[in-house]
């Protein structure tokens, strides 16, 4: 899977596979991601401005910002693809089962960080309280709090679970 920007080099890469006698993969070229305002393609050169707003396009930053991997996958899958017009919450297993290349939208899609917050909240509420407690522990430790009482952390997680977005 490579964005449509790679279409001009597709014949070259196809010939390389042919020359080496390798089996051709299924080549998929979805549309590019646009900046949140919909004006121009999203670029790593836009990273500094995004970080000032508390956002990022780099996977390594999402974890530090409190986003669950499940939420990031759900969000990213729905940029330029949809299963139907009703379903938006997907586990990884759901996506493996339901994803189809035929439902990719060829039009460029703007990155919507509010949707990422929304999906993160949905996935946080889908966790067990014990799982959430373990996932928030590092954030408390990083903030300088010593967590010596697992039951208290569990109680805090239970209260926070309905309010957290990220």
Where are these regions (language model features)?
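Internal mixed beta-strand/loop scaffold within catalytic domains of large alpha/beta enzymes
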Residues: 1-2
């Amino acid at each position: 899977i490579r964005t449509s920007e790679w279409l001009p080099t597709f014949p070259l890469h196809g010939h390389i596979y042919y020359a080496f006698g390798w089996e051709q993969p299924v080549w998929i070229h979805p549309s590019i991601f646009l900046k949140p305002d919909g004006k121009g393609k999203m670029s790593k050169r836009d990273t500094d401005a995004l970080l000032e707003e508390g956002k990022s396009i780099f996977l390594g930053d999402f974890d530090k910002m409190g986003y669950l991997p499940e939420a990031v996958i759900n969000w990213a899958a729905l940029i330029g693809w949809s299963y139907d017009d009703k379903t938006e919450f997907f586990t990884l297993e759901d996506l493996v089962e339901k994803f189809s290349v035929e439902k990719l939208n060829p039009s460029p899609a703007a990155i919507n960080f509010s949707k990422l917050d929304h999906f993160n909240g949905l996935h946080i509420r889908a966790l067990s309280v014990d799982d959430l407690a373990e996932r928030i522990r590092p954030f408390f430790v990083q903030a300088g709090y010593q967590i010596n009482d697992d039951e208290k952390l569990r109680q805090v997680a239970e209260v926070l679970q309905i309010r957290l977005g990220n």
